[in-house]
């Protein structure tokens, strides 16, 4: 895999608060190699290490995108949801930003059935068929459609399990991460000072609570994916 330059700037990361970790009492000792200091009761992440692993992650997603691979971005907590949707739409990736339904990947046949139902209901709504049903039936199906849109709207075009999964918060998305591990799907994970860096294929030491930090990391990954997709289009 060729290494590239991704314009990862330490000062920019500091301004975004990427280096701020959790309180020193809430930490995972496995993160010790990625922590540079303690300040006012919180751990400070070593941004040189962050830059290194973020660059590796960008190389990985560029290479995968240049070969037409598919990505899933997962981040369901309120601080991450908007950034996840924005990043996924920009890079034409699938995403989950409301709630991870258990078995979404490991029980793909069930997810696929739900997606077929979702597409059918969307088509019925688009063609006006729902409005021609009895009011009670129409209301029930519209509620079902709304629920499916909330939980599956970001993966409505997904036809199989993704090739790479990007996870914003390891603790919040632990179920998703375990499913990826079970299926052998490579993962890239924002890893705060209370996380286990060994669980992901590439762990990016970073603040996973600040919107500015989440957005900066996703922005770099999205740029690399878009560059890779452009390469794939030019050289199919």
UniProtKB/Swiss-Prot annotation:
Annotated localization: Plastid, Chloroplast
Record GO terms (molecular function): structural constituent of ribosome
Keywords: Chloroplast, Plastid, Ribonucleoprotein, Ribosomal protein
Entries under CDD domains matching the protein: RPS2
Example GO BP: translation
GO cellular component term, pick one: chloroplast
Highest taxon of source: Eukaryota
Location, primary (coarse class): plastid
Family: Belongs to the universal ribosomal protein uS2 family.
UniProt-recorded name of the protein: Small ribosomal subunit protein uS2c
Organism the protein comes from: Nicotiana tabacum
